[in-house]
């Protein structure tokens, strides 16, 4: 594996009591948490949602495994899915990103090809398996599936088969309901257990319209977004968000982030004649649910295409936004746009994280949105006001004809987790004087004015870039400590707008061995992308290239940041094998055992860190890349705690391919330290 594999980065991808004055006080005096608010992991033995709970906190109250004994962790069981992409046209893009969920006594997961599997949580023995039989010859934009969602019918008259259901979205845009006990399709849902999501959506290319994340469930309503292929054209599929009856599959409502008439609430911030032919602004990541208020919190991505906006002038409101939608009727409650007129592929990829904060003695329901820019934004999740001030700051202007970059962007007052400053030639890094010199030349030859430097015909350095910052792995939160944990990328990319006439010539040329090309049909420019690498294939910027970071919201500061990943098996043979941190995909979880677990890095290690200090306490070399977010649960008569991660590799990162699900636990009979004893 090498950094050069990153040349195909297609990541398609709150109360009225809080006034601006109160928000300002928050920064001065800090915030405190009530002793008891939302219960993190209501049933400590379950991880019943992709994010642990409906709030997406990626936190477990289990503490059998803790910093005092985590070094004893051993493999409890390993399951192999058998899915390695045989016969798949886009085999090179196959990524096993699933986070299992535990419900109804079984562990449920999906493969990259949407095969749903139920396992015994104690042994890893397969209980059932369902294959939706997607067409493997199609050229899907992404080949990934992050997980499934589960639902239980509370109607006492409907307690037979399919009273408990598993919902999964597919690469060919179906929403499928399965009986949780048997894996059989629920015949009363849609047509023979499935709903075709391509209905009532403009489809330009069926291979560009997918579902890659688990749906959100609010009561008996299933809410689903979509993944839309990046950069092929302006008029790609629109990012319509839809809701379906969990029992029948009947559509209840839809919400289109892009206006198609002047009555649309975002119409004033688009060129309306252009908006009707624009696509995307879709929600391809994981949504979160505020069950008390009946809201679904939805992160959206860029309108199409990513790197040229001359055909979608305006701020493109509702794209690159956090939306709060009433799940009962599909009405927008509030929205906050975190990138105006996106030209960088800065989709909101991370799952929103819902927490309860106490301000001036008043509990405030909040939501935290992590971003690819490395900024964290916190809002009152009922009304939408910022709880930490946001300032509109001037950013570099575009010099590309026809483009109108936004003159300002919203900057959070929470410390950024990535550098926002201009990259200078003196910042070049290398293993030798020679490659550092080459990196100096590369940096000097491209446009870079810091964060939000627009794409340019001479090539612009994007730092942070479209892989993050924080990507779909999101954040973990220890609500009692009010601490955030995030895996953060620090790898600049170069984006160059090129003439469509030279696209084929450049794509075939040996002059661009590390580049990825996209047509952006309907615009004057195609696009070329590549990591900012030295001739040796290592980044031109100093390490760390990936970090694990802890943020204290009470004090509004970064507590610690440590490299995530080593250069073991990466780069040229003479490169130092050090804990330099690597680019990664996947996110962390935190536990009451004072631990943060994370895989994600390119070296295929699964790691545990001390939550308080960031010290690495344990690591295990997985049999394949662990580019997924782990989960944990308690099972069996001994109430044994397990930590599970999918290890199947990542096509874009080029990590080792595999089909493993690996569960770790303390050895049976191992001494466990009682909670609270150090």
PLM regions: where:
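N-terminal secretory signal peptides that target proteins for export/translocation
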Residues: 1-14
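Bacterial N-terminal signal peptides
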Residues: 15-32
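Mature N-terminal segment immediately following signal peptide/propeptide cleavage
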Residues: 40-84, 99-102, 549
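Repeat-blade elements of multi-bladed beta-propeller folds
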Residues: 47-51, 92-113, 140-174, 207-233, ...
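Short aromatic-glycine motifs in intrinsically disordered, low-complexity regions
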Residues: 57-65, 173-180, 236, 314, ...
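Extracytoplasmic/lumenal domain signature
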Residues: 71-84, 116-138, 152-157, 175-206, ...
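Long, low-complexity segments enriched in small/aliphatic residues
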Residues: 409, 413-491, 500-503, 547-550
């Amino acid at each position: 594996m090498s950094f050069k594999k990153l040349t195909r980065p297609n990541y398609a991808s709150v109360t009225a009591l809080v006034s601006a004055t109160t928000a300002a006080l928050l920064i001065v005096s800090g915030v405190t948490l009530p002793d008891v608010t939302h219960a993190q992991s209501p049933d400590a033995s379950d991880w019943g949602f992709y994010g642990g709970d409906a709030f997406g906190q990626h936190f477990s109250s289990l503490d059998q495994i803790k910093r005092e004994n985590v070094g004893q962790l051993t493999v409890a069981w390993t399951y192999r899915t058998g899915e390695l992409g045989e016969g798949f046209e886009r085999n090179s893009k196959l990524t096993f990103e699933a986070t299992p969920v535990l419900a109804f006594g079984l562990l449920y997961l999906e493969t990259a090809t949407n095969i749903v599997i139920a396992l015994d949580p104690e042994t890893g023995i397969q209980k059932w398996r369902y294959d939706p039989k997607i067409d493997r010859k199609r050229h899907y934009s992404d080949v990934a599936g992050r997980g499934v969602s589960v639902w239980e019918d509370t109607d006492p008259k409907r307690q037979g088969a399919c009273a408990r259901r598993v919902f999964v979205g597919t690469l060919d845009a179906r929403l499928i309901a399965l009986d949780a006990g048997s894996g059989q399709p629920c015949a009363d849902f849609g047509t023979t257990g499935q709903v075709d999501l391509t209905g009532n959506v403009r489809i330009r290319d069926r291979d560009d319209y997918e579902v890659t994340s688990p749906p959100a469930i609010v009561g008996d309503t299933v809410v689903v977004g979509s993944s839309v292929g990046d950069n092929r054209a302006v008029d790609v599929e629109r990012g319509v968000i839809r809701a379906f009856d969990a029992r029948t599959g009947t559509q209840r409502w839809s919400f289109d982030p892009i206006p198609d008439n002047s009555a649309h609430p975002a119409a004033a911030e688009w060129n309306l004649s252009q908006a009707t032919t624009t696509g995307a602004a879709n929600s391809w990541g994981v949504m979160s649910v505020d069950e008390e208020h009946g809201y679904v919190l939805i992160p959206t991505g860029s309108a199409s295409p990513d790197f040229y906006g001359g055909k979608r002038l305006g701020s493109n409101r509702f794209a690159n936004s956090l939306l709060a939608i009433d799940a009962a009727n599909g009405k927008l409650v509030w929205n906050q746009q975190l990138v105006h007129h996106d030209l960088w592929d800065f989709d909101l990829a991370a799952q929103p994280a819902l927490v309860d904060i106490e301000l001036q003695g008043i509990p405030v329901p909040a939501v935290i949105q992590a971003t690819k820019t490395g900024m964290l934004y916190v809002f009152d999740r009922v009304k939408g006001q910022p709880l930490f001030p946001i300032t509109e700051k001037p950013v570099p202007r575009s010099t590309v004809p026809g483009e109108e970059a936004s003159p300002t962007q919203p900057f959070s007052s929470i410390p950024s987790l990535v550098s926002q400053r201009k990259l200078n030639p003196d910042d070049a890094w290398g293993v030798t004087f020679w490659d550092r010199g080459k990196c100096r030349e590369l940096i000097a030859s491209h446009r870079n004015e810091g964060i939000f430097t627009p794409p340019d015909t001479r090539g612009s350095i994007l730092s942070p870039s479209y892989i993050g910052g924080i990507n779909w792995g999101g954040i973990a939160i220890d609500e009692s400590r009010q601490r955030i944990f995030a895996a953060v990328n620090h790898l600049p990319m170069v984006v160059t707008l090129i003439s469509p006439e030279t696209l084929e010539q450049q794509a075939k040329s040996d002059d661009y061995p590390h580049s990825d090309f996209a047509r952006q049909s309907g615009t004057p420019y195609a696009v070329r992308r590549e990591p900012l690498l030295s001739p040796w294939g290592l980044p031109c910027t100093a390490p760390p290239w990936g970090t694990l970071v802890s943020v204290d919201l009470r004090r509004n500061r970064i507590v610690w940041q440590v490299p995530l990943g080593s250069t073991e098996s990466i780069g040229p043979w003479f490169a130092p094998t050090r804990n330099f941190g690597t680019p990664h995909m996947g996110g962390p979880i935190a536990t009451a055992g004072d631990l943060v677990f994370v895989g994600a890095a390119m070296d295929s290690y699964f790691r545990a860190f001390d939550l308080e200090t960031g010290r690495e306490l344990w690591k295990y070399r997985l049999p394949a890349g662990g580019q997924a977010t782990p989960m944990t649960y308690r099972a069996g008569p001994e109430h044994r705690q397990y930590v599970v991660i999918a290890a199947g590799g990542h096509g874009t990162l080029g990590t080792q391919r595999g089909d493993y699900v690996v569960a770790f636990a303390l050895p049976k009979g191992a001494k466990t330290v009682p909670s609270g004893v150090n």
